[in-house]
């Protein structure tokens, strides 16, 4: 796990039982809990995010959540940033703990591991810069119809600056241009599922209680947010976890 991300998600050495973090989470929401955890680190000169983060506990929790929700014969798409500031050995250990037998990866900006390690690549049925999936039930009144949905680590190219302005330049070549299709993405660590346009859904862990998102949940979200309006609420963006 990324040290800053692990701290923001409540996996810390100074609150190992999540007591204070969870109390804030339940009473004031995730943003308040994140701000508290980050503040503890920044206010203590003896700490930094690497010292404060319990990255092993973070990774164990993510693996446990996936195994609890995703079946052996399901298709699991991981939309990037699978491993960062960790060894490929640890990455492979986490992936091998997943009971799902059909793993697919979309490459994120922290995924250099796939270039150099064939055994890690072999754990996936596919690894692509961007991909598509056929999902059922997204259209209103067409419960059996399938629809092609784009899969990317990044929001649409036109929306990169909506969160972190530098992304519009840094990741322009990697992000897909808007083509009218719905998009599932990660990358932003925002706390809400809403994208910068109604066709985009953030399926990152921070917006979904650190749990994978099912096809049914995706369909339900798009049904609940079906609109012709061009207005989108401002995204609740955290500080960037780093380059």
Task: Please annotate each region the language model reported.
Residues 1, 81, 187:
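Conserved acidic functional residues
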Residues 121-242:
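Conserved beta-sheet core of the metallophosphoesterase superfamily
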Residues 4-139:
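Core catalytic region of metal-dependent phosphoesterases/phosphodiesterases
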Residues 2-6, 85-88, 112-116, 159-160, ...:
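Short catalytic/ligand-binding loop motif for oxyanion handling, primarily in non-cytosolic enzymes
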